[in-house]
């Protein structure tokens, strides 16, 4: 979707940003010094009937904290005040899109630690935790999800590699101007390399004079979606996944970094690695040519 500069749903993008800034404040140790690592956020946005974001309705922030005051009400009031006056101004300062900033009005409802004090967190507070949160790892509930978690799977599993490929396709298609919003769904049969189906939904926001089914046919012509080809194209057989452990797998920054690895035999290897290859806008020109844009 073109809601944000990184082609992500604005609801998830803002929730992830709130969490990153909150973590920065905690690690700096200068303000909100009571913060602990466990935290979560949710952003609710009002949309028009045409699917355009209109305003932020609600922001929820729950954060673990030290028990720094004997009076629970006073402690919770302090946390909420700091969220409003320390956290949120820093969050807004990180946003460079006027379109996104315009969603912040004076009537936003803030719920900060709405269940009360949050001193015990992590596995200590919740036994029987789920695996990686697959919706937060993708699009925050917008669109659809195949149901398989990413973390823990090697890239031969289409649960992971094809989800990255679908993201790569949808992002490049929207960036090329084919549609303002697009869902790309790829279906596979076990033991069959070629996808059995490619489904596209532009939610009525296509910019080209063709059906979603015709767009899907163009995608199958432009992109090789066999698992081995996806691995090769997106360089998925590299040690590039540590950064996906927090803040989601989609909408992240594509960059080249240098990493140092040490084996059990104390051998050191330095590698230059490209992170989040599925976020590259490297097929925009090909798409424009194919669609005559």
Regions found by a protein language model. Name each.
Residues 24-30, 89-97, 153-157, 166, ...:
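Flexible helix-coil linker/hinge segments at domain or subdomain boundaries
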Residues 181, 188-293:
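Internal helix-turn-beta structural module
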Residues 62-69, 107, 114-121, 126, ...:
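ATP-dependent carboxylate activation and anion-phosphoryl transfer catalytic cores
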Residues 12-23, 80-89, 133, 137, ...:
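Predominant activation on well-ordered alpha-helical scaffold segments within soluble catalytic domains
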Residues 7-11, 15, 72, 76-80, ...:
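Short, charged, low-complexity patches
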Residues 1, 41-66, 122-143, 186, ...:
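Short beta-strand elements
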Residues 1-120, 246, 251-255, 266-292:
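Glycine-rich, mobile lid/loop segments that gate access to catalytic sites or pores
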Residues 7, 88, 129-180:
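Conserved mixed alpha/beta catalytic, RNA-binding, or beta-rich assembly cores of soluble enzyme
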């Amino acid at each position: 979707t073109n809601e944000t500069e990184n082609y992500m749903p604005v609801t998830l993008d803002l929730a992830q940003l709130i969490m990153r800034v909150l973590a920065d404040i905690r690690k700096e140790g200068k303000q909100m010094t009571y913060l602990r690592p466990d935290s979560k956020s949710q952003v609710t946005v009002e949309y028009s009937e045409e699917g355009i974001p209109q305003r932020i309705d609600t922001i929820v922030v729950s954060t673990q904290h030290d028990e720094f005051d004997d009076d629970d009400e006073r402690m919770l009031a302090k946390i909420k005040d700091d969220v409003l006056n320390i956290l949120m101004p820093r969050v807004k300062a990180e946003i460079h899109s006027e379109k996104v900033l315009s969603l912040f009005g004076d009537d936003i409802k803030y719920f900060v630690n709405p269940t009360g004090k949050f001193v015990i967190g992590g596995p200590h507070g919740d036994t029987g935790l789920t695996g990686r949160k697959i919706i937060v790892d993708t699009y925050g509930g917008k669109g659809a999800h195949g149901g398989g978690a990413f973390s823990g799977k090697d890239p031969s599993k289409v649960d992971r590699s094809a989800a990255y490929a679908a993201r790569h396709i949808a992002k490049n298609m929207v960036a090329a101007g084919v549609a303002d919003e697009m869902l790309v769904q790829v279906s596979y049969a076990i033991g069959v390399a070629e996808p059995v189906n490619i489904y596209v939904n532009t939610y009525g926001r296509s910019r080209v004079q063709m059906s979603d089914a015709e767009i899907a046919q163009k995608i199958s012509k432009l992109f090789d979606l066999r698992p081995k080809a996806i691995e090769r194209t997106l360089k998925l057989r590299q040690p590039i996944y540590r950064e996906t452990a927090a803040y989601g797998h989609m909408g992240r920054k594509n960059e080249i970094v240098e990493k140092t690895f040490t084996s059990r035999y104390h051998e050191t290897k330095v590698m230059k690695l490209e992170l989040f290859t599925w976020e590259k806008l490297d097929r925009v020109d090909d798409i424009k040519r194919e669609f005559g844009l």
